[in-house]
Curated annotation (Swiss-Prot):
A Pfam entry, by short name: Rota_VP2
Task performed by this protein: Inner capsid protein that self-assembles to form an icosahedral capsid with a T=2 symmetry, which consists of 120 copies of VP2, with channels at each of its five-fold vertices. This capsid constitutes the innermost concentric layer of the viral mature particle. It encapsidates the polymerase VP1, the capping enzyme VP3 and the genomic dsRNA, thereby defining the core.
Region annotated Disordered, chain positions: 1-48
Record's protein name: Inner capsid protein VP2
Subcellular location: Virion
Length: 892
């Protein structure tokens, strides 16, 4: 009927359009009597409508929805029915358009990507090192003669491997914080030297050294003409030493003493632990191990060299559910998407045939044909896809503790009756408060109160009691009041299982007995007289209840099936299931609940073992990564505090922490939550390994500064030009190697107090001042760039008399405000500058002091996926039993 009227609607519209055009032409030519008549007629029609007692239904004008004349003449119920169908169709079109729109908005992220991000979080397999950890590397530097020209000889010094300081104003302390962050990222969980060892090319007997970088250093030193013969002979003898009885091997390595300290620490504090069959079996969640529906078997015995890294599964260190609405919403959303992917599907073969069921329902409703009666909409929207979607939504929302909101039409009594099953089975906490109140109020005012002839409930917004709680006190019927009492007290029970907080369902729901309570209440309601309502109304409600009560057995089975799937998958969750209402909600249509209630068959559907293992692995990996990133962030915050960078770096540290969790859209997180997160992180203790590593850096800051080409240990400032000195490493440069004879002021103290008067007085008295402290500087050793910035005539003689490429002029910038300091500054060819950089000589490379023997296990194998050793199968689904040792689905 709904679609047959579309032609009439279009016809009406076209006729209207023609009439309007004719009126416009007439108005242009003659604007008198007809206009007045039309106005009078319109006024008359309006007054008739206002004074008329005949009810007329007015709808929105969207999509030009109009009601044909024949429909207006039909009964009130038929009008409402047609309107509902048209409205439903319109809303469906809107939803489709909204989905299309969402996919075209660039900022929208499809949920598949969240799932991929979660599944891509792997255990720390990436931290298996193929090289030793190094901050330093030996480098050959030329020696400069007295006249500033290079010699052919070279000398070896320890320099920084990554000497990266950004341009401009930059605090050296930030360099050390970034270095520490880098070490935390690269810090290996275990070191197996045998895996990284490479052949020593210069060895006499095909010996091996610890890694490729050691081999390259040995190669370069061996080929250096100035290397002593004894060192060459030593390199030729460098090889590994195996002690097979103790399962250890020693490898020679070339390392700076600080790098040696780092690698020794990593070797002595490895995270690997022995692995055996018992550990793997205990790794499987206990409830799945003890579930008789799953048959688990170990495929093989593990060798004694098997190792694994124990996942870090500490609970609730940040309590993100408490006062972090945006973060908690993102976590629950990602958990919901993951949970939906593992909840088993109710395929069409496992459900009752939709056509057959609708036909049976039509017979139960005594519909000879699908005429427009209020009962016809009971059948609207029933399909297997909606049933499956509802099943997955309910279980996934409970697993992720994600709040649901209910979408329903008050006039569809079947939806409301299905909603009564939903509210009976799912705890109240799972629904948005406003949505729960609206649904309960609709059930009370449409079904419960009319049955007993009670007046409509007028619910005050903000009332602490829900409509069901108010109704429980007012209804005298024992069965109905008893059912309302159960719903009002239906909450999750919080139980700690295997150290994890679980939200468990009431035992009456788990075994399905609560459905009998629901049916008793429904039967009582259907027997009532509905004294204040028409007979048709009573008949519609009774038939809706009949449809649901005819499926009593299936509803008991459905309730047991939902409970079993929820509890089995819940065993794979490793993070505490904290329950807090989420900012955004998952929409649940009550028509899809009707589909599930009406189409559920007698086929048992339980998660496959592979699905359970996958869900468990993803949960463990995310949880472990979450805790490791917390440890990193806590360590960096502590380091920033001790380096006096607390205020400067704090927000970026928290942002990095969230980015590394991979599921957060960091720019959208409100600042207040960022700072609250900082406060929580600040209260946590630093993990031992990370603290020891930071102390190693702190103790050796000066050595690291000396090895950098971009960090100075101080600066000398004079009022008049100072003559540059020859330096063996750089030629004529404005570098001072000692501070003898200079008055020294601590740079940090100066910056803290801000009292520069002392410096000014000294400079005016022509006394050079030495500001001592680490500071960055910029170097440019290109002759061309210097000539480009200065008068070329200054360099004319030098260019003429010497080879330009033998010189190494250096330009130093202490910070973005300082002057530039050049090699040549006057016409006497005596290099001068008003500023000198105080730079200590880097540590010379001494082969004997740099050769270290490192010891590790000869061999072991680290396994990351422990569950790959377990083969699993299930019993025949029809025989699957629930916690009470009875079949999940009894209705056969």
């Amino acid at each position: 009927m709904a679609y047959r009227k579309r032609g009439a609607k279009r016809e009406d519209l076209s006729q209207q359009h023609e009439r309007l055009q004719e009126k416009e032409i007439e108005n242009n030519t003659d604007v008198t009597m007809e206009n007045k008549n039309n106005n009078n007629n319109r006024k008359q029609r309006l007054s008739d409508k206002v004074l008329s007692q005949k009810e007329e239904i007015i709808t929105d004008v969207q999509d030009d929805i109009k009601i044909a004349d024949e429909v207006k003449k039909s009964s009130k119920e038929e009008s409402k029915q047609l309107l509902e169908i048209l409205k439903t169709k319109e809303e469906h079109q809107k939803e489709v358009q909204y989905e299309i729109l969402q996919k075209t908005i660039p900022t929208f992220e499809p949920k598949e990507s969240i799932l991929k991000k979660l599944e891509d979080i792997r255990p720390e397999q990436a931290k298996k090192q193929m090289k030793l950890f190094r901050i330093f590397e030996p480098r050959q530097l030329p020696i400069y003669r007295t006249n500033g020209e290079k010699e052919l000889r070279n000398r070896w010094y320890w320099k920084l491997k990554k000497d990266t300081l950004p341009d401009g104003d930059y605090d050296v302390r930030e360099y050390f914080l970034n270095l520490y962050d880098q070490i935390l990222i690269e810090m290996p969980d275990y070191l197996l030297l045998k895996d990284m060892a490479v052949e020593n090319k210069n060895s006499r007997d095909a010996g091996k050294v610890v890694d490729s970088e050691t081999a390259n250093i040995c190669d370069a030193i061996f080929q250096d003409e100035e290397t002593e013969g004894v060192i060459r002979r030593f390199i030729a003898d460098m090889r590994q030493q195996v002690q097979s009885d103790r399962n250890i091997v020693n490898y020679p390595s070339i390392l700076h003493p600080i790098d040696h300290a780092f690698n020794e620490y990593f070797l002595n504090h490895q995270l690997v632990e022995p692995l055996n069959n018992e550990i793997i079996f205990n790794y499987i969640p206990e409830r799945i191990r003890n579930d008789v529906n799953y048959i688990l078997n170990m495929d093989m015995n593990l060798p004694s060299t098997a190792r694994y890294i124990r996942p870090n599964l500490l609970q609730d260190r940040l309590n993100l559910h408490d006062n972090f609405e945006s973060l908690w919403d993102t976590i629950t959303t990602s958990n919901y998407v993951l949970a939906r992917s593992v909840v088993p599907d109710l395929k069409e073969k496992e459900l009752v045939s939709t056509e057959a069921q609708i036909q049976k329902m039509s017979q139960d409703l005594q519909l000879e044909a699908l005429t427009i009666q209020s009962e016809t909409q009971f059948l609207a929207g029933i399909n297997s896809q909606a049933a499956n979607d509802c099943f997955k939504t309910l279980i996934a929302a409970m697993l992720s503790q994600r709040t649901m909101s209910l979408d329903f039409v008050t006039t569809n009594y079947m939806s409301l009756i299905s909603g009564m099953w939903l509210l009976t089975v799912i705890p109240n906490d799972m629904f948005l408060r406003e949505s729960l109140v609206a649904c309960e109020l609709a059930i009370i005012n449409t079904i419960v109160y009319p049955a007993f002839g009670m007046q409509r409930m007028h619910y005050r917004n903000g009332d602490p009691q829900t409509p069901f709680q108010i109704a429980e006190q007012q209804i005298q019927n024992f069965q109905v009041a008893n059912w309302l009492h159960f719903i009002n007290n239906n909450r999750f029970r919080q139980v700690v299982i295997d150290g994890v907080l679980n939200q468990t369902l009431n035992d009456n729901i788990r075994n399905g007995q609560v459905i009998n309570q629901l049916m008793e209440a429904l039967m009582q309601l259907s027997r009532q007289q509905f004294p204040t309502m028409p007979v048709d109304y009573k008949r519609s409600i009774q038939r809706g209840i009949l449809l649901l009560s005819n499926r009593l057995g299936q509803l008991v089975d459905l309730t047991r099936l939902v409970s079993y799937n929820y509890e089995t998958l819940m065993a794979c969750i490793t993070m505490n299931m904290q329950h807090v209402q989420t900012l955004t909600t998952e929409k649940l249509q009550l028509t899809s609940v009707t589909s599930l209630c009406m189409l559920i068959g007698n086929t048992t559907v339980i998660p496959s073992p592979q699905t359970l293992f996958h869900y468990y692995n993803v949960s463990v990996n995310f949880h472990s990564n979450y805790n490791e990133r917390i440890n990193d962030a806590v360590a960096i915050i502590t380091a920033a505090n001790r380096l006096n960078l607390y205020q400067k770096k704090m927000k970026s540290i928290v942002e990095d922490f969230l980015k590394r969790l991979q599921i957060f859209d960091v720019p959208r997180v409100p600042d207040d939550q960022m700072y609250r997160l900082r406060d929580r992180l600040r209260l946590l203790p630093v993990e031992r390994r990370r603290l020891d590593i930071f102390n190693l850096i702190l103790m050796n800051m000066e050595q690291i500064e000396r090895a950098s080409d971009k960090i100075a240990q101080g600066v000398l400032i004079a009022y008049r030009d100072m003559q540059l000195e020859r330096d063996e490493m750089y030629g004529f440069v404005n570098i001072a190697r000692n501070l003898d004879g200079y008055q020294q002021i601590n740079l940090e103290e100066l910056m803290r107090t801000g009292d520069y008067g002392q410096i000014t007085n000294m400079l005016l008295n022509n006394q050079p001042v030495a500001l001592v402290g680490a500071l960055p500087f910029v170097t440019d050793s290109s002759v061309i760039s210097l000539i480009a910035k200065l008068d070329a005539t200054v360099f004319a003689q030098i260019v003429k008399l010497r080879k330009v490429d033998t010189l190494k002029p250096i330009l130093y910038k202490i910070n973005s405000d300082s002057n530039d300091f050049y090699l040549v500054a006057n016409y006497d060819w005596i290099p001068t500058s008003t500023t000198k950089v105080y730079k200590q000589v880097p540590q010379p490379f001494d082969f004997r002091a740099s050769m270290h023997m490192l010891t590790s296990n000869l061999t072991f194998t680290v396994y990351s996926d422990l569950l790959s050793f377990v083969s699993a199968d299930t019993v025949e689904p029809i025989n699957a039993i629930a916690f009470d040792n009875m079949r999940i689905m009894n209705e056969l």
